Amino acid sequence: MSTESMIRDVELAEEALPKKAWGPQNSSRCLCLSLFSFLLVAGATTLFCLLNFGVIGPQREEKFPNNLPIIGSMAQTLTLRSSSQNSSDKPVAHVVANHQVDEQLEWLSRGANALLANGMDLKDNQLVIPADGLYLVYSQVLFKGQGCSSYVLLTHTVSRFAVSYEDKVNLLSAIKSPCPKETPEGSELKPWYEPIYLGGVFQLEKGDRLSAEVNLPKYLDFAESGQVYFGVIAL
């Protein structure tokens, strides 16, 4: 029932009352009727406002139907947590050179800054891939010498021995020469340093073996840790 209808009913009720001479009793009745009419109109108006603004009555479901925003936020959080957990389970290896051996490049998986995790293995100086997938392969060496009594050519190579074929295939390779020409006899022999860094992404198979080698290990500089290393990271 609308507010206008309720007011109209009150007015009709007042007109239907018998018109009598105004006296003390009739004045009291009119006052009570007026007060009742006012309270009725005020209550109806308040009820209409509460219903119109949704304070009472059935709630509007269009604000968050089925709690989709909350569920979506929770799903996104769970996805991010799952993604970070999966990243920590991926195979990874970082091996360093053994500085205690002379004129050879031997990799160590134990010690400072060395790491083998989640299935990676170091066997016969080669890193063994534990599962199929994309891998970041990288390696760095640092050569050091004193003068150039002869022409020096330095190479650094990362090779793959695949399960599907036994041939050795070079994945990464670089060649450098610190001495473009020989140092004349009697001249001052100046020290030289030559770093080589290799890196790339490759599709590898389970059981593949990777090696990192140099042609002249006698020139390797093991004076500082972190100068010669070899690593693989699953993507």
From Swiss-Prot:
Membrane topology qualifier: Single-pass type II membrane protein
Annotated S-S bridges: C148-C179
Keywords: Cell membrane, Cytokine, Disulfide bond, Glycoprotein, Lipoprotein, Membrane, Myristate, Phosphoprotein, Secreted, Signal-anchor, Transmembrane, Transmembrane helix
GO cellular component, one term: plasma membrane
A biological process from GO: positive regulation of transcription by RNA polymerase II
Transmembrane spans: 36-56
Signal peptide boundaries: none
Boundaries of every THD domain copy: 91-235
GO molecular function: cytokine activity; tumor necrosis factor receptor binding
Sites where a glycan is attached: S83, N86
InterPro entries to which the protein is assigned, alphabetical: TNF, TNF_alpha, TNF_CS, TNF_dom, Tumour_necrosis_fac-like_dom
Subcellular location: Cell membrane
UniProt cross-references to PROSITE patterns, sorted A to Z: THD_1, THD_2
Ranges in the topological domain labelled Extracellular: 57-235
Protein's recorded name: Tumor necrosis factor
Gene3D superfamilies reported in the protein's UniProt record: 2.60.120.40
A Pfam family per the record: TNF
